[in-house]
Amino acid sequence: MKTKLREMLRFPCFFTYKIIGLAQPELIDQIIKVIQIQIPGDYTPQVKSSNRGNYLSVSITICAKNFEQIECLYHEISKINIVRMVL
């Protein structure tokens, strides 16, 4: 799958992550903090709450210069303890 994704993308390109995490106030700040370290910029995430309000879905778009940035951010965002899934 990684090879196919790498072949499909032309850099620089916009890439959107969808992150599912616990509905805690610090979730969005922690995600943006991780992204700012790799790719500084002004980010406006789209946030939706789950039906029961236990989880948040955060969609955030970056401008990646290479595939390694996409992979690195995927792994770094996954390390946030209140993140449950990164797509």
Curated annotation (Swiss-Prot):
PANTHER family: UPF0250 PROTEIN YBED. One of its GO terms (cellular component) is cytosol. NCBIfam families: PRK04998.1. It comes from the Bacteria. Belongs to the UPF0250 family. This is UPF0250 protein BU488.
